[in-house]
Amino acid sequence: MIMFALPNKGRISEPVMKVLEKAGLKITVKGRSLFANTVDDNIKVMFARARDIPEFVADGVADIGVTGYDLVLERNVEDKVDFLLDFGFGFAKLVLAAPESSNINSIDDIKEGMRVATEFPNLTKKYFEKLNKKVEIIELSGATEIAPFIGIADLISDLTSTGTTLRLNRLKVIDEIVSSTTRLIANKNSLKDKEKREKINQIVIAIKSVLFAETKRLIMMNAPKDKVEEIRKLIPGMAGPTVSKVLSDDNMVAIHAVVNEDEIFTLVPKLHALGARDILVVPIERIL
């Protein structure tokens, strides 16, 4: 059996659950239970804080788990787990920031003994050790942005996605410590077990098929026969476009291909200019 640790709340919880649902791994949640069954009797789910999941996976409490890359590093377990895939969302940066009114504008302005407030003491400590700077790390459990303004810190080390919260609190970024995205991690011993490894691989393939499909679209159209080669150059597809006969018109063929979503805006007018009509663009659930 596979124990799958998932975030019980937070910014990555909902998008992760949506991906798993699209992947066909339906999770049956009863009330506020910390454990849940899935459509596969051999896969069970446990819900936990995202910051605790790296430790749970490293210790073997869970076989696999979803968490932030930054949290794996903060827990010092990056050598005790395997990174299986990057979800490509939940992007954030751990940054060093100081009040806009301060004289700190670069890391060179940080003096020995300055105080840094953070929820990420281990990552922050490693950062300053690499810089060979001796600072005092003050661990907080929230509201880090206020620390410099109430006199308990000179700087902060905090997680940000857009930088909006920092700007609203009159803080400026001095340096980036680490960037992070949502990751699927696995216990190393679990991957050594043949049965568990096979089941984990099934989960990885299912998730990858959803993540890959999210960046693609299926485009379908009817087009003149004599324009097929020109259209083929525009939409090579994953293995070339599929072309079939249109029964109602000998001069037309049906063409469909998988294309990148970000190409659609410029692609459709070009196809239309070549005589393509009845153009349909359809989302894709999964691509294997």
Swiss-Prot record:
<dbReference type="InterPro" id="IPR011322">
    <property type="entry name" value="N-reg_PII-like_a/b"/>
</dbReference>
<dbReference type="GO" id="GO:0000287">
    <property type="term" value="F:magnesium ion binding"/>
</dbReference>
<dbReference type="GO" id="GO:0003879">
    <property type="term" value="F:ATP phosphoribosyltransferase activity"/>
</dbReference>
<dbReference type="Pfam" id="PF08029">
    <property type="entry name" value="HisG_C"/>
</dbReference>
<comment type="similarity">
    <text>Belongs to the ATP phosphoribosyltransferase family. Long subfamily.</text>
</comment>
<dbReference type="InterPro" id="IPR020621">
    <property type="entry name" value="ATP-PRT_HisG_long"/>
</dbReference>
<dbReference type="InterPro" id="IPR018198">
    <property type="entry name" value="ATP_PRibTrfase_CS"/>
</dbReference>
<keyword id="KW-0067">ATP-binding</keyword>
<comment type="function">
    <text>Catalyzes the condensation of ATP and 5-phosphoribose 1-diphosphate to form N'-(5'-phosphoribosyl)-ATP (PR-ATP). Has a crucial role in the pathway because the rate of histidine biosynthesis seems to be controlled primarily by regulation of HisG enzymatic activity.</text>
</comment>
<protein>
    <recommendedName>
        <fullName>ATP phosphoribosyltransferase</fullName>
        <ecNumber>2.4.2.17</ecNumber>
    </recommendedName>
</protein>
<keyword id="KW-0328">Glycosyltransferase</keyword>
<dbReference type="GO" id="GO:0005737">
    <property type="term" value="C:cytoplasm"/>
</dbReference>
<keyword id="KW-0460">Magnesium</keyword>
<dbReference type="GO" id="GO:0005524">
    <property type="term" value="F:ATP binding"/>
</dbReference>
<keyword id="KW-0479">Metal-binding</keyword>
<keyword id="KW-0547">Nucleotide-binding</keyword>
<dbReference type="InterPro" id="IPR013115">
    <property type="entry name" value="HisG_C"/>
</dbReference>
<dbReference type="InterPro" id="IPR013820">
    <property type="entry name" value="ATP_PRibTrfase_cat"/>
</dbReference>
<keyword id="KW-0808">Transferase</keyword>
<keyword id="KW-0028">Amino-acid biosynthesis</keyword>
<dbReference type="InterPro" id="IPR001348">
    <property type="entry name" value="ATP_PRibTrfase_HisG"/>
</dbReference>
<comment type="pathway">
    <text>Amino-acid biosynthesis; L-histidine biosynthesis; L-histidine from 5-phospho-alpha-D-ribose 1-diphosphate: step 1/9.</text>
</comment>
<dbReference type="InterPro" id="IPR015867">
    <property type="entry name" value="N-reg_PII/ATP_PRibTrfase_C"/>
</dbReference>
<dbReference type="GO" id="GO:0000105">
    <property type="term" value="P:L-histidine biosynthetic process"/>
</dbReference>
<keyword id="KW-0963">Cytoplasm</keyword>
<dbReference type="Pfam" id="PF01634">
    <property type="entry name" value="HisG"/>
</dbReference>
<keyword id="KW-0368">Histidine biosynthesis</keyword>
